[in-house]
Curated annotation (Swiss-Prot):
Organism: Cupriavidus necator (strain ATCC 17699 / DSM 428 / KCTC 22496 / NCIMB 10442 / H16 / Stanier 337)
Family: Belongs to the bacterial ribosomal protein bS18 family.
Protein's gene: rpsR
Protein name in the entry: Small ribosomal subunit protein bS18
One cellular component term from this protein's GO annotations in UniProt: cytosolic small ribosomal subunit
Protein task: Binds as a heterodimer with protein bS6 to the central domain of the 16S rRNA, where it helps stabilize the platform of the 30S subunit.
GO MF annotation: an example: structural constituent of ribosome
Gene3D superfamilies noted in UniProt: Ribosomal protein S18
Pfam families, per the entry: Ribosomal_S18
InterPro entries reported for this sequence: Ribosomal_bS18, Ribosomal_bS18_CS, Ribosomal_bS18_sf
């Protein structure tokens, strides 16, 4: 089996053309300098919930573990207080 050697120039071009190429993820909360995630900030929390109503995992969003735990707790509190729906069946 033959292997094709790519130099850096071709590698960069290949990554940009590849539809599966994703940009490097970063933690939004670290960049913004957030200390505590608030359960009342629904606009931020909605960004971390998928179409089906599930909490998006940190490996997909790039959120650090410290903030992912806070995010998880904040979403659960908002759901408990009926600020957010538990499932996608409840449209706003």
């Amino acid at each position: 089996m033959a292997f094709v050697k790519r130099d850096n120039k071709n590698k960069k071009r290949f990554q940009q053309q590849n539809p599966l190429f994703k940009r490097k993820r970063f933690c939004r909360f670290t960049v913004a300098g957030v200390e505590q995630i608030d359960y009342k900030d629904l606009d931020t929390l909605k960004d971390f919930i998928g179409d089906n109503g599930k909490i998006t995992p940190a490996r997909l969003t790039g959120t650090k573990a410290h903030y992912q735990r806070q995010l998880d707790t904040a979403i659960k509190r908002a759901r408990f207080l009926a600020l957010m729906p538990y499932t996608d069946l409840h449209k706003n």
